[in-house]
Amino acid sequence: MSKGRVLVAMSGGVDSSAAAALLVEQGYEVIGATMQVWDYSTCDIEEGNGTCCSSIDVDDARAVADRLGIPFYVINCEAKFRAAVIDPFLKAYLEGQTPLPCVNCNTYLKFDHLVKKMRELECDYIATGHYAKIVYDDKGKASIHTSTDDWKDQTYFLFTIDPELVPKLLFPVGDMKKPQVREYSESRGLVTARKKDSQGICFVGNQGYQNFIKDHVKSEILASKKGLIKRFPEGQVMASHEGIHNYTYGQSKGLGMDYHEKLFVIKIDASDNTVWVGEEKHLFANEVDVVDPKLLDEIQDGEIMNVKIRYQHKGAPAQVIKTASGFKLKFTEPQRAVTPGQAAVFYRDRQLVGGGWITL
């Protein structure tokens, strides 16, 4: 007897392939679906080499579905992806921020577009290859927790999920480590078993985000983002630059200037296109403002939580204080290179509680 019908989001990578295979083994009625999100022929990227949902990835996902004997759908999401992921990505850099496109992709495509497909196909669950876990408490309430593989854990990108969707989520590889996922996939004869992981931003690839921006933003707009590099905090003009989109907080290489000491980007002021550089000590901050929060569970005003300010950040204890626009975070220890456009994500032990967007 089937445990229920589940739609698996298959990116064409090993993790989602393994997720589909595990669910078949566990007795679910599995349906695979891949989102075609981007025309990689418009970019200087080799398809299938660290990409996600390209035509080659779609073919790989279909091959896995055929191997498993499950139905498979391709959903064209290019227009939605452009509007919800690419355009905000470009806009953020032009405003002096460092965007986090994976969260937008999860919010507006994986857990929106695919959820609609899940309901259309009358599925009971939706599954992905994310490294995360669903845990039920003694009252039967479901919550998202970090995965067994701390290094690969992807809960940082999941804080915008609708809480009502959580009981319908399955993360089959959440109890496994990456080498186990590859070994399992190989044992099942899946073509993706030794496929490279996607690295960095999937639609940018190895060309670098500056080149991607240059290819997708009009030259006159880029020219309007030129400005000065000034010393922080004194204000001494040190050089000119070719655009604030070429810089991010904490950057120390490729500043476009020579100086006798190592300097870092401390602040980017989009109002006058000034890039402020200074000593590393100026990168540290005790307090951070977070806007547009999304919560999966309640937070007590002033509660101490473990907060991650970027992916692969180990997290640090901070007091979470409610404000009119979101939260103010007061860290126990100063944090380095707190970056506007990135997310601050809250954890209670291993439970994902919510998060919001960093602003300075």
UniProtKB/Swiss-Prot annotation:
GO terms for cellular component: cytoplasm. Pfam families: tRNA_Me_trans, tRNA_Me_trans_C, tRNA_Me_trans_M. The active site is at residues 105, 202. Coiled coil: none annotated. Its main location: cytoplasm. GO terms for biological process: tRNA wobble position uridine thiolation. The keyword tRNA-binding applies. Catalyzes the 2-thiolation of uridine at the wobble position (U34) of tRNA, leading to the formation of s(2)U34. This is tRNA-specific 2-thiouridylase MnmA. It comes from Bdellovibrio bacteriovorus (strain ATCC 15356 / DSM 50701 / NCIMB 9529 / HD100).
